[in-house]
């Protein structure tokens, strides 16, 4: 079993569970999940995962605000973050990269591409 740990932050149960299954089966990674940006920040700080998959569109604290807080925190700023988005415009992707995202995955996603992008972020 791979010892790498991935944190998935997404408010949609079905998407979060699908991503968790893909990462566990295809990558052999240990997966933690959070249902909100607030919960994700707490888990990221306490568990210090090797990578984070973060949904942009969430209630309360959206993914971009969560990303900025992760980047501003001395404990979590080194963790690579891959954003999950339904927004595929090039201008959005440029902004996400400028904010510190290591990668961007568009929804709906291909499970093989998801696992490959996580593997690349872990290198």
Residue spans of the language-model regions?
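A Lys-centered signature of the CheY-like receiver
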Residues: 55, 107
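Alpha4 helix (beta4-alpha4-beta5 surface) of REC/receiver domains from two-component response regulators
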Residues: 65, 88-105, 116
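Active-site beta3 strand of CheY-like receiver
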Residues: 47-53
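C-terminal output helix
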Residues: 109-119
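Two-component/phosphorelay signaling modules centered on CheY-like receiver
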Residues: 13-32
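Helix N-cap/capping motif at the beta->alpha junctions
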Residues: 33-42, 63-65
């Amino acid at each position: 079993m791979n010892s790498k740990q991935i944190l998935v932050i997404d408010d949609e149960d079905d998407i979060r569970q699908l991503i968790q299954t893909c990462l566990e089966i295809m990558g052999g990674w240990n997966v933690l999940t959070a249902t909100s940006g607030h919960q994700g920040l707490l888990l990221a700080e306490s568990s210090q995962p090797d990578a984070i998959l973060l949904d942009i569109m969430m209630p309360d604290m959206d993914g971009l605000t969560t990303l900025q807080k992760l980047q501003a925190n001395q404990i979590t700023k080194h963790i690579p973050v891959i954003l999950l988005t339904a927004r595929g415009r090039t201008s959005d992707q440029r902004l996400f990269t400028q904010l510190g995202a290591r990668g961007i995955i568009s929804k709906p996603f291909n499970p093989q591409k998801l696992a490959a992008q996580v593997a690349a972020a872990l290198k």
